[in-house]
C-alpha cells in the first residue's frame, strides 16, 4: 500500500520506529547504540573517499611509468585554501586528458573511479563559488608527474579540513 500524503508517511515511520524501539532496544545499552547510530548517520564520511582518491592517484602514477605520455597539464601548484574547490575541479578536468592520452583501459577505469569519488566528496562544497581564483587555463602547464604530485597535495588539504 502506497501512502501519498507525506504527513501520513511520517506517522507510519514513527509507528514502525516505536515498535522497533519497544521490541529490540529495551535495554539502556540498546538505546545508546541506537542514538549513536543516528548521530553517526549524519556525520560526513568524505575522508575515506579522499584516501581512496590518493590511492587511485598512486595507481595512475604506477600505470603511466611504463608509458611515454608527453602531455602538459594545467596544474595549480600553490593552492590557496579559499580556492581549493575551484582547483580540484580543474584537476579533475585535466585528469581526463591523462585518460584520453594514455588510451589504456586500466588508466581510464581508474580515472573514472577517481572522478566519481572526488565528485561525491565535493558534493557538499561543489556549488560553492570561490572568488579571486584562477581559471584552469590560467594555471601553469606542468608534466604529468608534477601534476599528480600537486593533485595529491590538494587532496591532502581536503583530508586535513574534513
From Swiss-Prot:
GO terms for cellular component: cytoplasm; cytosol; endosome; extracellular region; extracellular space; Golgi apparatus; nuclear speck; nucleoplasm. Glycans are attached at residue 127. One of its GO terms (molecular function) is cytokine receptor binding. Induction: By interferon-gamma. It comes from the Eukaryota. Pfam families: IL15 (PF02372). SUPFAM superfamilies: 4-helical cytokines. The keyword Disulfide bond applies. Keywords: Cytokine, Cytoplasm, Disulfide bond, Glycoprotein, Nucleus, Secreted, Signal. Residues 1-29 form the signal peptide. InterPro entries: 4_helix_cytokine-like_core (IPR009079), IL-15 (IPR020439), IL-15/IL-21_fam (IPR003443), IL-15_mml (IPR020466). GO terms for biological process: cell maturation; cell-cell signaling; extrathymic T cell selection; immune response; interleukin-15-mediated signaling pathway; lymph node development; macrophage differentiation; natural killer cell differentiation. Residues 30-48 form a propeptide. Most abundant in placenta and skeletal muscle. It is also detected in the heart, lung, liver and kidney. IL15-S21AA is preferentially expressed in tissues such as testis and thymus. Disulfide bonds join 83-133, 90-136. Belongs to the IL-15/IL-21 family. Cytokine that plays a major role in the development of inflammatory and protective immune responses to microbial invaders and parasites by modulating immune cells of both the innate and adaptive immune systems. Stimulates the proliferation of natural killer cells, T-cells and B-cells and promotes the secretion of several cytokines. In monocytes, induces the production of IL8 and monocyte chemotactic protein 1/CCL2, two chemokines that attract neutrophils and monocytes respectively to sites of infection. This is Interleukin-15.
Amino acid at each position: 500500500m502506497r501512502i501519498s500524503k507525506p504527513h501520513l508517511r511520517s506517522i507510519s515511520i514513527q509507528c514502525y520506529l516505536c515498535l522497533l524501539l519497544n521490541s529490540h532496544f529495551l535495554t539502556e545499552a540498546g538505546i545508546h547504540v541506537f542514538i549513536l547510530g543516528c548521530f553517526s548517520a549524519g556525520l560526513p564520511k568524505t575522508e575515506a573517499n579522499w584516501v581512496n582518491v590518493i590511492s587511485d592517484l598512486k595507481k595512475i602514477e604506477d600505470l603511466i611509468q611504463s608509458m611515454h605520455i608527453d602531455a602538459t597539464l594545467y596544474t595549480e601548484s600553490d593552492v590557496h585554501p579559499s580556492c581549493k574547490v575551484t582547483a580540484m575541479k580543474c584537476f579533475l578536468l585535466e585528469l581526463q586528458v591523462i585518460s584520453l592520452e594514455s588510451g589504456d583501459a586500466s588508466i581510464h577505469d581508474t580515472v573514472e573511479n577517481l572522478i566519481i569519488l572526488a565528485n561525491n566528496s565535493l558534493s557538499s562544497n561543489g556549488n560553492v563559488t570561490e572568488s579571486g581564483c584562477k581559471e584552469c587555463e590560467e594555471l601553469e602547464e606542468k608534466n604529468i608527474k608534477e601534476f599528480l604530485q600537486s593533485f595529491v597535495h590538494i587532496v591532502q588539504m581536503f583530508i586535513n579540513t574534513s
